[in-house]
A protein has these predicted regions:
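Divalent cation-coordinating acidic motifs and surrounding scaffolds
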Residues: 1-255
């Protein structure tokens, strides 16, 4: 209940009721629906407009049971027209495989990317189509580990770096395929990249996803200097004041 209350307050008072919210580390659809209900209840109690969020989530592959999902505002803007019309929700590449050096395989995407295609409606009758891809990529845990690896990997760190790179390439290829399919499609990639916006030396997965990789010899991951996205994606964090360009505080350090 405390978490629901805090998240509801953040959505209402800090985020100001966004039209679409991408969420990560959600237990299941029921939990997301509970959050949507709590936001509505709190909004009404505080004399705020009820956003009538609809929840969308598809179960993924994570052993801990966490998934990515969306809250979409369906409050009416005119007549019976909702603020956002959801056209499709698709889980991408849930069965894609990660190949180890010994030729054994495992699922690449523990939390597969979730694509939502929607139309935002305005009171005056105008509409705007948008495609969102909600991501939660492999963490940085053990990225520099030197402990002996398995399945043909020399170290555990080598495996982590390779998996992070392959996830970045998979997402970049997804974005590029959609750009090639329709140059006019507005694509927004959001979520938890578990990556810095700069090259950290281990790898630069964020740059790979955006289409601005660093030269191969500047990271510990072989073969990551290939540009897979054209035109490049824009890092919207750069539109914020410098002091606000962080999404997490780790041991007192904003990052």
């Amino acid at each position: 209940a405390t978490r629901l209350a805090k998240t509801s307050k953040a959505v209402r008072e800090n985020l100001k009721f966004p039209d679409i919210i991408g969420l990560q580390e959600v237990e299941n659809l029921g939990a997301l629906q509970s959050l949507a209900t709590r936001i509505s209840t709190d909004a009404i109690a505080n004399a705020q407009p009820d956003p009538l969020y609809a929840a969308y989530l598809v179960e993924g592959n994570d052993v801990g049971g966490i998934d990515v999902g969306y809250l979409v505002k369906t409050a009416v803007v005119s007549g019976v027209t909702p603020r956002v019309t959801v056209n499709s929700v698709v889980q991408e590449d849930a069965g894609e495989l990660f190949v180890n050096p010994d030729a054994s395989t495992e699922l690449l995407n523990d939390r597969p990317n979730l694509r939502l295609m929607a139309t935002v409606n305005f009171a005056g009758g105008q509409t705007s189509a948008i495609t969102l891809v909600n991501v939660h990529l492999r963490s940085l845990n053990s990225v520099g580990a030197t402990t002996p690896g398995s399945n043909g990997w020399l170290t555990d760190g080598e495996r982590v770096r390779a998996k992070r790179q392959k996830q970045a390439e998979s997402l970049a290829n997804l974005v590029q395929a959609r750009q090639v399919g329709s140059a006019a499609e507005r694509i927004l990639v959001l979520g938890d990249y578990n990556a810095f916006e700069v090259n950290d030396g281990f790898g630069h997965s964020f740059g790979v996803i955006r289409g601005v990789p660093v030269p191969d010899n500047e990271t510990a991951v072989p073969g990551d200097g290939v540009d897979l996205v054209n035109p490049d994606l824009t890092d919207l964090a750069t539109t914020l004041p410098v002091a606000q360009r962080y999404s997490y505080t780790f041991d007192g350090n904003a990052q």
